[in-house]
Amino acid sequence: MMNMLSDRKKLILKAVVENYSQKRQPVGSKMLTYLPYLKFASATIRYDMVQLEKEGFLQKNHTSSGRVPSFKGYVYYLNHLLTRDHDVACMFESIDKVIQKKRFCKGQVIKEALNLLNNLTNYTTMAIGSDIFNNSKITKIDFIPLNSAQAVILIITDKGNVQHQNISLEQTKEISIYDLKDVVQVVNDLLKDKFLSEAAHIIQSDFFKKTIAKYICFQEQLIALFMEAFSSFASENLYFSGVSKMLEKPELNNPEIIKKFMGLLERKELLKIMLNQDSLSFKFSDGLQLTPLKDCMILSIPFDVNPNEKGRIAVVGPSWMKYPKVIPILEYLAVHLSKLNDQE
């Protein structure tokens, strides 16, 4: 049903998205009549815009007679209507120069490429250099008591990665350090030989909650502890560039929102959005309850870290970002980062 728009409606939706992206002003039917590929009467365009609004692809701006894209409209545009801007090819030479800096290790090349992507798009950029989440299995979860109220939990993977989490029972009288040791043993048996991505799903499942139901007073803390550890594994190769670019946006001109956004980055929660995607993907803030931004989106794409592992690069910006420009730059960068394997 989503793909059953008439050709005329598709052209109008595409025009609204791209016009709004460029001018950041609600789009009216009269404005669209000046476009060379929309040779229709203003009344015809206006009628179709009303229909697109009723179907949820456009929405009315209360301060103007024009319309702006809805999240549904953006999704349809990205899946069916996007055309790449070939003029961005002039920027590819600067990407090639970064990729060809053989004196840098791969991690440094990724950082340099990320800084360049930030400069080319003017948006916050980030990368995960290795998809540890999908390629590393848990070999052991160990419990080390420090005293009667404190302990350390170690999570070890088959790739030799280790994360530790401190745990305190000082304010929990319903469970002892010995009970906790038993719980961790149960978790170890449950997650051993599981990929970190599988383990993350298990930890958040109803099945897991039932398994440790006996210790319900400590359930939420335990789940949060393991999820933080899993995110920490992935963040070992996490890079950011241009965070200040997001803080310059008018929507973030609020101390409370800035605090939430910085906390989002510090807690590595954006990792959960980027992981487990095997192609160019996008997430809008209406489906991202963890982001404090109203009109935010994350556009990400995988690249080969080595023949067996994938990383991801991403752009974090407003929903009205210039997709015809940003996407081909992102795709070109991903392809050429993947080619680093051929040079080793």
Curated annotation (Swiss-Prot):
Belongs to the HrcA family. One of its GO terms (molecular function) is DNA binding. HAMAP family: HrcA. This is Heat-inducible transcription repressor HrcA. Keywords: Repressor, Stress response, Transcription, Transcription regulation. InterPro entries: GAF-like_dom_sf (IPR029016), HrcA (IPR002571), HrcA_C (IPR021153), WH-like_DNA-bd_sf (IPR036388), WH_DNA-bd_sf (IPR036390), WHTH_transcript_rep_HrcA_IDD (IPR023120). The lineage of its organism: Bacteria, Bacillati, Mycoplasmatota, Mollicutes, Acholeplasmatales. It comes from Aster yellows witches'-broom phytoplasma (strain AYWB). GO terms for biological process: negative regulation of DNA-templated transcription. Pfam families: HrcA. Negative regulator of class I heat shock genes (grpE-dnaK-dnaJ and groELS operons). Prevents heat-shock induction of these operons.
